[in-house]
């Protein structure tokens, strides 16, 4: 896939990209900020977002899921416009500059590195924590 998806079909195609055994690209762009405020949460450089997302899934999320069971993705990919809006409005988003190569998967950080991060919930642990374990 080259360039930002420009149609529903191309966005569906992006969502069907398999990042690992358990995860697809469509698992990661959900954003309450984007949905509530009508801001598209679509990568401008899907090929970079896919490469970063694959590493996140293969090196971190798959091993966590193999150990603890199903994971819930709370926040992952953010388009720069979504992240900037969230930062400006105090919605728990760091600045875009701090989120390149983090939540903004398709833009490189100041050192030129790509990366991806996700905020996750481990239901197994959440249940134990609720019941008093830590």
Task: Give residue ranges: language-model regions.
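Short secondary-structure junctions
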Residues: 64-71
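A broad, structure-centric signal for solvent-exposed, well-ordered loop/edge residues
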Residues: 26, 80, 127-129
């Amino acid at each position: 896939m080259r360039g930002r998806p420009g149609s529903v079909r191309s966005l569906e195609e992006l969502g069907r990209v398999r990042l690992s055994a358990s995860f697809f690209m469509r698992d990661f762009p959900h954003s309450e900020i984007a949905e509530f405020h009508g801001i598209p949460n679509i990568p401008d450089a899907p090929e970079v977002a896919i490469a970063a997302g694959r590493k996140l899934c293969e090196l971190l999320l798959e091993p966590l899921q193999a150990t603890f069971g199903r994971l819930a993705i709370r926040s992952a990919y953010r388009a720069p416009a979504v992240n900037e809006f969230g930062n400006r409005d105090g919605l728990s988003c760091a600045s875009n500059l701090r989120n390149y190569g983090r939540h903004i998967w398709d833009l490189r950080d100041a050192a030129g590195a790509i990366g991806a991060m996700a905020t996750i919930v481990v239901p197994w642990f959440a249940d134990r924590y609720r019941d008093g374990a830590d």
